[in-house]
């Protein structure tokens, strides 16, 4: 089965006389015959949000709180630029924007002791400049931080940033994944490749007990699932931004 066929038809098999399109069910809860069956619906790799902007915010804020610093490409979507330069600045998060085509030495100079992550877009919106993911990943890892890549414009059909070294990938499903016509949403995908415990002092939210969640230390309890589990159990719980039924079909 080809990607195009899966993207259009996979996951819904209507019976005789049933609608070709999956119906929207206005319900917040669903019945399952066993906890095992329900557990098979979930994976540690990703989560959905109410918008692409929510996905980018959660992806960054999950590991970069007040007092933290982000190194970001200046060649990014205006909304993401303002999220970092204005909104998150009000929350105590600092950002240094760099020319993504600058030399490794110039980009290295942007890092600080409190840098928590790097951020860029596979294809910049709207200038369509291509990010050198391997270069960014190498630089980020040399400084002990993960690389977060917004893959909205490229979509997984054209590029899989994790294959090139990205640790966390975000999408605005509103755009190319959906067609920018029938729904609004976002997604965060974690590769599970970044070793949070090896850089424990940089990421206390993952490597020390969370008083809001029974004292759990996410990195120790959940291993590769630590990042997404924290984003779901903590940020989604406290800040919302869940997909609505009308955008979940």
Q: Each PLM stretch: what is its role?
A:
Residues 1-45:
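N-terminal "arm"/small-domain region of PLP-dependent enzymes with the aminotransferase-like
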